[in-house]
Amino acid sequence: MVNWYLHNGSVYRNQIIKQESVLILGGLIVAFGEAADEARQLFRGPIRDFDAGGQLISAGFIDLHTHLREPGFENKETIASGTMAAVAGGFTTVCPMPNTNPALDSLEVFDDLAKRIRNNAHCKVQPIAALTQGRQGTKTVDYKGFKARGVVLFSDDGDPLDENVAEEAFVGVGEVGGVLINHLEDKALIGKGFFYEQIPPESEYLMLRRDLELVRKTRCRYHVAHVSAWQTVELITKAKAEGLPVTAEVTPHHLTLTYEDIKEPRGHFQMKPPLRTEKDRRALVEALNSGVIDIVATDHAPHGTEKEQGLFDGSPFGVTALETTFRSLYTELVLKGTLSLERLLYSLTIAPGAILGVEAELKVGVRADVVVLDLIQEKVITKELFQSKGTNSPFIGRTLQGWPSLTLVDGCPVYAHAGEVYTC
């Protein structure tokens, strides 16, 4: 069913929330408010009347930093399981990083991945291509070829861009109008220690300082991944004031947790960059509020059951996040008054859509990528709730509020929380 009449709910559009209905016909949004109500009365075709019961209706979320693990690491996640986790979390578009096996570094690999996506994805998937072949940092990829395939974002995620090839990569990505994402981690500064001591903030902000010089020189669009340190925020603030083409993201775990929340050294708190101090966390929240940080990105990095009992030493980095992102931020920030609901929704829809170059707002005539959010329901996070193969979440055992109840992609129902079965 691609015809829907969503009524008795609040709608987030034009960056405000107000009570109105939404009419979707043929997978397109055709009317809001009184116009939607009147058109529904005149429509004689098959349609699903959905009583939102006071819930919030928003454009589907967009994640610019996901790890779907396929091909090569299907024991951790697959396109099918990862995108099912996405729609369960309210995401209708995800951008998977290229740290797969093989890496997404050639058009042949891209074509194979595109086929897998067509056959298995539950939502829209916009792959991120590698910056260098094999993500080895020595030889750049065919940026023009990838751009012709519709790729916008380029990254060697997990591996910082080597000094010897950095300028060539910035020039190449800039020439095709792409966006370069670098993993900010100066490995020369990585040491030994526990929690955040092992990967100091200097490893992040000093590499960003280098990259910003290349942005000044090349004018390449640049996106700062998973900001974690207050010093990094200061550099981004100055770069934006200077007019550099820079955007930035922050993860839900860095917005809501610090190293002090780690009560025992379990592997599901192991992440890059690490959880830092309360000063850092507050700086990140303030930066998201002010627009210095543009978007929330999940950095969803499932590792399957092999990580669950792991200690920090030897445990792989990354946490499962697609299904807890909205819930954790709504619970820990919105309900506590440190972030507005409108700003949270903006950072998950309009802002990432602008970076990716896709429509991400509820408007007449656009494809109906929609999520309906129950802001009242709360549940304790357990392993059994996850659609993802990974349950390595720092929110296990926490009570979170704000759950997607329905997710539509092009008007097709891809997720219903209460167990209703809809057909497209």
Task: Please annotate each region the language model reported.
Residues 1-43:
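N-terminal metal-binding scaffold of metallo-dependent hydrolase/deaminase domains
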Residues 9, 311-314, 364-424:
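C-terminal cap of metal-dependent C-N hydrolases
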Residues 9, 22, 27, 54, ...:
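Divalent metal-coordination and catalytic microenvironments
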Residues 38-58:
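Active-site metal-binding motif and surrounding structural segment of the metallo-beta-lactamase
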Residues 53-117:
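Metal-associated gating/positioning segment near the N- to mid-region
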Residues 58, 107-124, 171-182, 324, ...:
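Alpha-helix-loop-beta-strand connector modules within alpha/beta enzyme cores
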Residues 140-296:
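Histidine/acidic residue-rich metal-binding segments in metalloenzymes
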Residues 196-198, 202-219, 289-290, 294-296, ...:
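His/Asp/Glu-enriched, well-ordered alpha-helical/loop segment
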